[in-house]
Amino acid sequence: NTEDCPSNVFVTANPLNKTSNILLANGNCSVGTSNTGTDEYISGTIAFGNGKYYWENKITSPGDPAIGIVPAEYNNNQIGNQRVMYHENGTIYSDGLGISSISTGVTYTSGDIISVAFDTENGIIKWYKNNTLVNNSTITNSQLEFSNKLWVPIFYCANGNGTATIQANFGNGYFGTTAVASAGTNASGNGIFEYDVP
């Protein structure tokens, strides 16, 4: 069963806006790469409107992953130019956006769940590792002018083995084909997530 339906549409990875070696599975919610040593990106299908948004990403295999947001206007040849991404090495990269990269000191690996909370009303993005806020991961509107652009999710991986590196849950309640273990609370009642939505 899926929560995604015509009256309740969730984001997926966008097969029309990706670099060439990205692999997709499970309704375009599992992302990986068949290549090694090249930067591979894919954006999400739906831009964030005015409101608060949350999604979860389970890391399922080594693959140099990073998760974040990118301006919706960019096509597959540009989505690496401006992006805000939390990388498995613990660094938040903000290439092309005029602020320095941020070292959080919090790495992640296979089995971890990385959540993203993006508040477009107040211009704040935060990352969580296994339901704990990542140190120094909060970026504000004054730094990146979130309110001046439309943004979509972005997934990055560089060293793939042909399997999914990231399994995203935008509200369907699944990581790949596995249901979330313990559905958290959600004030809007929209979607099923592993953890309580902050």
Describe the residue ranges of each PLM region.
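PRY/SPRY (B30.2) beta-sandwich protein-interaction domains
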Residues: N1-P198
